[in-house]
A protein has these predicted regions:
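Charged catalytic carboxylate motif
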Residues: 4, 8, 36, 94, ...
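Short amphipathic alpha-helical/adjacent loop interface patches that line ligand
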Residues: 9, 13, 58, 141
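Generic secondary-structure signature for well-ordered alpha-helical cores
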Residues: 17-21, 67, 100, 104, ...
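Helix-loop-strand module that forms the ligand-binding subsite of alpha/beta enzymes
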Residues: 29-114
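Glycine-rich phosphate/pyrophosphate-binding loop and the adjoining helix
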Residues: 33, 107-153
Length: 153
């Protein structure tokens, strides 16, 4: 809605896309389904923090795909990105718990970017993610892709 998470996801996808032999799909949670989960070798889950948790659309994605992928994607790599207004830890923890149920393996600690948006105006304002934060997301995407390409993950 305000663009912060999308900027983070695009940066991670750009980093991953530079690895030879790795195909990257950048999908919105509302558009992604069980087949997308099943055909991927790794996952970067990006969500805004909404009311101290992951977004409703991300929760809907997990609700729609969880059982279709259960016991079929064990051991695959994942990473969590959170664009938060104040904290983001609960959103990251929610995703980590779902990923643990899928028996996914984290490649890094969740990356939580805090925008410090605390008023309704700040929360609803379009976000401009700083270059250093986008670079960190790009680096994490590259790490994911490199690890997959080398068979580490």
């Amino acid at each position: 809605m305000t663009g912060g998470t999308l900027q983070m996801a695009r940066a991670a996808a750009a980093g991953a896309g530079g690895e030879a032999g790795v195909a990257v799909s950048l999908l919105r949670a509302a558009e992604a389904g069980a087949e997308d989960v099943l055909k991927a070798d790794g996952y970067i889950f990006a969500t805004p923090e909404n009311l101290a948790g992951m977004s409703g659309m991300m929760k809907d994605f997990f609700d729609r795909t969880y059982y279709a992928a259960f016991e079929r994607i064990n051991g695959r790599a994942f990473l969590t990105l959170v664009c938060a207004g104040s904290d983001g830890r609960n959103a990251a923890q929610q995703i980590d718990r779902i990923a643990a149920g899928w028996r996914l393996k984290p490649i890094a600690d969740p990356y939580i970017l805090c925008t410090h948006a605390q008023t309704p105006e700040q929360i609803l304002q379009p976000k401009m993610i700083e270059a250093a934060s986008r670079a960190r997301c790009e680096e994490l995407g590259k790490t994911m892709a490199s690890g997959l390409a080398m068979g580490i993950f």
